[in-house]
């Protein structure tokens, strides 16, 4: 039984995130999607809002679990008995950043392995920050985020 953890801010969740989750859940016995909650960061959506969206989006997979976490991801992995961290990489700059994190995580816990997953190429340009900016200008988000996320983005932007 191999448990894996896929952590991120998911602010908001995108089709790229879901593509990685869908593929990971076919490889690993369990995939734990962990919503990062860092009080020093400014998120558009609260941790609970992001968790709720991700739960809705992943409910079709019985082996995918969603939680929030506000500490080191290796500690979460150890807590649930996972030994794999999944990291999505779209390009060389993503890989460079994620490689450094993988080395650091390995230093924190020798049992942790990092698996890099490349999303389908049609999702390479998706960045949550760009999607939020596009939404703020009323841009078309179809093909970037699921309808429930698009609706939540529009509602959140109207509040601001």
UniProtKB/Swiss-Prot annotation:
Pfam families: CTP_transf_like (PF01467). The record marks 17 as: Transition state stabilizer. It catalyses: (R)-4'-phosphopantetheine + ATP + H(+) = 3'-dephospho-CoA + diphosphate. The keyword ATP-binding applies. Its cofactor is Mg(2+). It is found in: Cytoplasm. One of its GO terms (biological process) is coenzyme A biosynthetic process. ATP binds at residues 9-10, 17, 88-90, 98, 123-129. Its main location: cytoplasm. Substrate binds at residues 9, 41, 73, 87. One of its GO terms (molecular function) is ATP binding. Homohexamer. Belongs to the bacterial CoaD family. Reversibly transfers an adenylyl group from ATP to 4'-phosphopantetheine, yielding dephospho-CoA (dPCoA) and pyrophosphate. HAMAP family: PPAT_bact. This is Phosphopantetheine adenylyltransferase. It comes from Treponema denticola (strain ATCC 35405 / DSM 14222 / CIP 103919 / JCM 8153 / KCTC 15104).
